[in-house]
Amino acid sequence: MPRMAMRREGFRPPPPGGILASEPKGAPTMAFRCDLILRDATLVDGTGAPRRRGDVAVRGDRIAAIGDLSGMAADREVMAGGRVVAPGFIDAHSHDDQAVLCGPACMLCKTSQGVTTVVVGNCGISLSPVPMAERPPAPMDGICAPEWWIFDSFAAYAERLRASPSAVNTLALIGHMSLRIGAMGRDTGRPATDKEAERMRKQLAQALSEGAAGFSTGLFYPPSKAAPTEEVIAVAEALREHRGLYVTHMRDEADQVLDSIEETLRIGRAVGAPVIISHHKCAQPENHGRSAESLALIERHAAGYPVAFDVYPYTASSTSLAARPPRADVPVTVTYSVPHPEMAGRALEGIAAEWGVDLAEAARRLAPGGGVFHNMAEADVRRILAHPLSMVGSDGGPLAPHPHPRLWGTFPRVLGHYSRELGLFDLETAVHKMTGRTAAIFGIPDRGVLREGAFADLVLFDAATVRDRASFAEPRQVAEGILETWVNGQSVYTQSGGASETPAGRLLHREAPETV
């Protein structure tokens, strides 16, 4: 097939101009030619190293060269004009298990943020290896629609993903809740028997052998709440042989947050697995300020054991309405309700007043349903986000009709609000927390960095204007200042054109060190 004529593209200042192509020019004769060159960019390489000016060349799915590439030509050239080229962002904590199976356009909420890889199977919830014939219990029902619980093995889920690729790369965990329901049915309000725990361990081991990266728990939620520490250790023993990760939505993120951290590290150490604490927070007003204690405890463990945590840049969480009894001092907005879908986006307090009932009764009538809970302190969010052990994860729920804005805004919010506006950390650190650090923790080779030979997962953004536009009132808003996103060398999003239909994503596998 003949090569296309070179296209040279540039950027004009401010308004939402995005990527603007000039008239195609004939390709000069060059010794080396590639598919794409991003010229005159500010390179933030994902390692935390200082930014530098230069060009990036892409050939196929890899970065072919970085530096002064004036002697090279490409089928497409983009004039960055000093705007930032960085590794594509890695969402350390997503619930995109279903979304990655629905076609490339389903991932606009992530590609429009510059996200090129998502980690699925979090909080103990994964679409495999347990099919379900009826609606799963909360919070599983808010993650994936009932008709998608059809995969009886991780291999089946992986094959579906390979057959119908997403716009983004996917790294997958196996969820404890899913395993528990597979082994125990709906009788999960008790500890598993030894036989049931062994069945879960074997299923986890099989999934890890088929390419899953680790094991996640959601010990806060009813399907797993009754599981004692010993049960989790027994199941997680499969991680030892396969060198998988232990990732957890801890048993408690409020009054018992310190005890939950201790339990988490006990589990990880017992099976020799690196530990990732999901969406670390100190929830509920009486715990505001306790992040100083929780971070100090994590630091003590991290001095001798691999432990990290992810965080999202908001003071509100989002989960099932049944997760905690509602409180007058914690405002709640409904994200979805099965019996009352018309209430999505409404305040629980207003619904209760309209119905003439208290908050608890309103939540009961809305269930199954979900909500946004304004239960954190800004000072804690900043302290956790700025901590060197943190990385960024959205925890976004793509199915809710009125989702938490983190689904659409997490990564631009870190760049625009917390880095540029508040100066919580510099741009290099912000990018590192969303790229190189995350790739290293999850064991994803050749991603998360700008380096010759690395995969061409890239984002081009304007550091002066990038910001989140998604709000609690209008959560489905595309970010500003993310100009283009590439996955494995293919463009999957442009600010001017939106999401492409390019199925550029791949299923990724963890490459773990021999020892913890």
Place the predicted regions along the sequence by residue.
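Active-site microenvironment of metallo-dependent hydrolases
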Residues: R3, R7, R12-G54, R59-R62, ...
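Short, ordered loop/turn segments at secondary-structure junctions
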Residues: C123-G124, F220, M250-D252, H280, ...
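Short acidic, glycine/serine/threonine-rich loops at helix termini
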Residues: S128-R135, I181-D187, T229, L258-E262, ...
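Glycine-rich tight-turn/loop motif centered on a GG-T
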Residues: A138-I150, R186-D194, S224-K225, V247-T248, ...
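Divalent metal-binding pocket/active-site signature
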Residues: Q206-T264
